[in-house]
């Protein structure tokens, strides 16, 4: 196998963050134009961003909001869930996915994941459906679409809504169709570490005009005309500054996603040859956008996951654990009686996963440096 020798530029210690927002002169100019206009909210930038994003993913409606959590919250509010209703969510995700179910007075029901992709397992979803189930929230984790064909079949059989948590999958595709267009509603985040960012921000996508109208009302105080409010709503509007940044970032998204895929392919090439490390698995149907590049540290790798992360940190390589425990084991959920939930694949994954830098600022020498530091402990 190829050996990544620590010599020349590769030998020099590097500082490589796990994520790096890429903002430049175009974003600065877009912000300057907004500031000079004097219109910081409810101007043309948000509307233009919504139209551009809807066109990019391929839906009739896109609604810009303050962040990805709010996107999920408003999507669920639009469904008008009742107390005691159940929503099936993955046990392996960022906690906002299930928290937003609790915000409605509904109950998140945790389903296990597929070992290879870390996405929600349709077979376990099917087992968890009850008479109280009203919706599913598949998460397109780390940038790979979930098995939406099977999940939509389950939803159709049981007359359930499907809300896509697309917070990590900007531009990802399932059989050529972009995430955020596959269910009843799609929810995106533009947090600073995402494939495209507005600092904070979110977007809700749908082809359902009735749901879109309800979401727009909820976003803006339930207001249909100035000082006329038909429902109880909120102030969840995106600012003009955020939208201006988003418009610039959206234009760069495909190119940057392609750089992520190229970096991932180079990482795959090295990691596949290191005994005890398993690279990400990509489904045949998927156009993965690698929000995170997540490996599994197996039992036969010389270092346990935490020790490997510590070693990489010492060498300047940023890593992260997405995620260290199932949501149902978080203290806030234990108090709600979820401590008896069992999702064995999730629990095993939580002790093995490790995210490595894959963002567009990572270059060829960075990848060689990562490989050399992974290989140094391997007998391969």
Roles of regions detected by a PLM:
Residues 39-86, 100-104, 110-112, 177:
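Phosphate-binding glycine-rich loop
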Residues 164-197, 225-230:
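Conserved active-site segment immediately N-terminal to the catalytic lysine
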Residues 63, 88, 109, 162-163, ...:
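Structural detector of well-ordered beta-strand residues that form the stable sheet scaffold
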Residues 2-39, 44, 315, 357:
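N-terminal "arm"/small-domain region of PLP-dependent enzymes with the aminotransferase-like
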Residues 189, 202-207, 247:
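Short beta-strand-to-turn element immediately C-terminal to the catalytic PLP-Schiff-base lysine
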Residues 77-166, 173:
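PLP-dependent aminotransferase-like
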